[in-house]
Amino acid sequence: MENKELRERMLSGKMYNDLSVELVQRREQAVFLTNDYNSTYGKPKEVREALLRKLLRCIGSSVHFEPNFRCEFGFNISIGNNFFANFDCIMLDGNLITIGDNVLLGP
């Protein structure tokens, strides 16, 4: 199954191969990038933002996750401006997750 068809099936709610090579690789990439992001706590904002831009579909300005942030893929997550997530945020993005502007997310 082509990558485009696989993602279309995911987003439409149809059955798809969750263990396809692409999805396994994207999960691994998400693990590495979230680990990197979580380990940069206290580093310059630009360093942390660059990691989020590699991981997530789209982010606005002033986006912050307290450690430990986790997601399944990252490519289905869009976040607006002025976002804060408290510790241990987990986003399972087998489908689109869209968060608007001026959002505080906490336990």
Can you describe what each PLM-predicted range is?
Residues 1-62:
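Terminal amphipathic alpha-helical/low-complexity segments used for targeting or macromolecular assembly
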Residues 61-71, 77, 81-89, 97, ...:
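A structural motif detector for beta-strand N-caps
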